[in-house]
């Protein structure tokens, strides 16, 4: 497992980071639509929903880029998992309350005609992405990342770092 773990971590970084970059980029051009998408969940005061509609795309881009380059993998993995859990809570409450909205996960969002809302697919996707974030939090040392892999210990409590 030790030889495959860094490769699995690389795949997890690229999938999770690439997804976050795509989501952030697609919202970045139309932040007003991102705000509409967040408001459609009817969870937060309008001013906070508008704020998150602007901040989340920047956050997704930043965390996604850090994951792809392999910088701060443990913390960005944890932040990604928390973000996905937040998305899952928002989507679940919209579904439970019978709201008819598009999740706005990759741009767009807001109200949709009755019967056109799809909650299961985004929930399954976000669950998988959250699991990738948890994996990276637990196993942050991956191939081709900027984070340093710790040197193997030579004796109890010593390392090769000098």
Language-model regions, residue ranges each:
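Extended, low-polarity transmembrane helix blocks
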Residues: 1-29, 69-162
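Short hydrophobic/aromatic-rich motifs at helix boundaries and adjacent loops
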Residues: 6-10, 35-38, 61-62
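Solvent-exposed, well-ordered loop and adjacent helix/strand elements within mature globular domains
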Residues: 23-56
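A generic alpha-helix propensity feature with a strong bias for hydrophobic helices
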Residues: 48, 60, 153-155
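Hydrophobic alpha-helical transmembrane segments
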Residues: 51-69
């Amino acid at each position: 497992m030790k030889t495959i773990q860094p490769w699995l971590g690389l795949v997890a970084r690229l999938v999770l980071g690439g997804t976050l970059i795509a989501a952030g980029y697609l919202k970045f051009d139309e932040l007003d639509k991102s705000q509409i998408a967040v408001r459609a969940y009817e969870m937060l005061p309008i001013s906070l929903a508008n704020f998150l509609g602007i901040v989340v795309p920047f956050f997704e881009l930043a965390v996604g880029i850090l994951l792809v380059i392999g910088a701060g993998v443990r913390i960005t993995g944890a932040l990604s998992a928390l973000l996905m859990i937040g998305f899952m809570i928002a989507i679940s409450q919209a579904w439970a309350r019978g709201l008819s909205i598009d999740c706005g996960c990759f741009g767009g969002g807001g109200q949709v005609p009755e019967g056109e809302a799809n909650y299961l697919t985004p929930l399954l996707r976000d669950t998988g992405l959250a699991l990738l974030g948890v994996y990276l939090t637990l196993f942050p040392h991956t191939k081709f990342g900027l984070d340093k892999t710790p040197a193997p210990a030579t004796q109890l409590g010593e390392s090769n770092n000098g």
